[in-house]
Amino acid sequence: MELDLINEHKIGVTKGTELEKEVQANFEGECKEVGLYLAMARQAQREGLPEVAEVLIRIAMEEAQHAAHFAEMNGLISENLKENIEMMLKGECMANKEKKAAATKAKELGIDPAHDFFDESSRDEARHAKMLKGILDRYFK
């Protein structure tokens, strides 16, 4: 069946325009807010306020959706899912190595909490990479 669509989402509508810098600034701001809201949610949990944590998590997810729209507007992803997954797979592999190096540095400096988290998140990046590779192997042969 042929689709006769007249209105769709488009990737990269602000790329190369005078709005590109504003969209990029908003993308970066929204990403930062996601991390801050999630950190605040963790603090709320530590303070025994789980319902506050859930509200903050919800706000973080809405901010992440905003970031996603800004990423689409500036063409930070392509219109080809396989290419996007391959791009992210490379990034996860790089993050795996960089976080492990940061863990080693933190250990040398005697900053155990930083070492522990960098080491753990390095393994998370490896897990993410394996998941993305699995998707590529199964769906994009």
From Swiss-Prot:
<dbReference type="GO" id="GO:0016491">
    <property type="term" value="F:oxidoreductase activity"/>
</dbReference>
<dbReference type="GO" id="GO:0005506">
    <property type="term" value="F:iron ion binding"/>
</dbReference>
<feature type="binding site">
    <location>
        <position position="66"/>
    </location>
    <ligand>
        <name>Fe cation</name>
    </ligand>
</feature>
<protein>
    <recommendedName>
        <fullName>Uncharacterized protein MJ0746</fullName>
    </recommendedName>
</protein>
<feature type="domain" description="Ferritin-like diiron">
    <location>
        <begin position="13"/>
        <end position="141"/>
    </location>
</feature>
<keyword id="KW-0408">Iron</keyword>
<dbReference type="InterPro" id="IPR009078">
    <property type="entry name" value="Ferritin-like_SF"/>
</dbReference>
<dbReference type="InterPro" id="IPR003251">
    <property type="entry name" value="Rr_diiron-bd_dom"/>
</dbReference>
<dbReference type="InterPro" id="IPR009040">
    <property type="entry name" value="Ferritin-like_diiron"/>
</dbReference>
<dbReference type="InterPro" id="IPR012347">
    <property type="entry name" value="Ferritin-like"/>
</dbReference>
<feature type="binding site">
    <location>
        <position position="63"/>
    </location>
    <ligand>
        <name>Fe cation</name>
    </ligand>
</feature>
<dbReference type="Pfam" id="PF02915">
    <property type="entry name" value="Rubrerythrin"/>
</dbReference>
<feature type="binding site">
    <location>
        <position position="128"/>
    </location>
    <ligand>
        <name>Fe cation</name>
    </ligand>
</feature>
<keyword id="KW-0479">Metal-binding</keyword>
<dbReference type="InterPro" id="IPR052773">
    <property type="entry name" value="Anaerobic_Peroxidase-Rel"/>
</dbReference>
<feature type="binding site">
    <location>
        <position position="125"/>
    </location>
    <ligand>
        <name>Fe cation</name>
    </ligand>
</feature>
<dbReference type="InterPro" id="IPR045236">
    <property type="entry name" value="RevRr_diiron-bd_dom"/>
</dbReference>
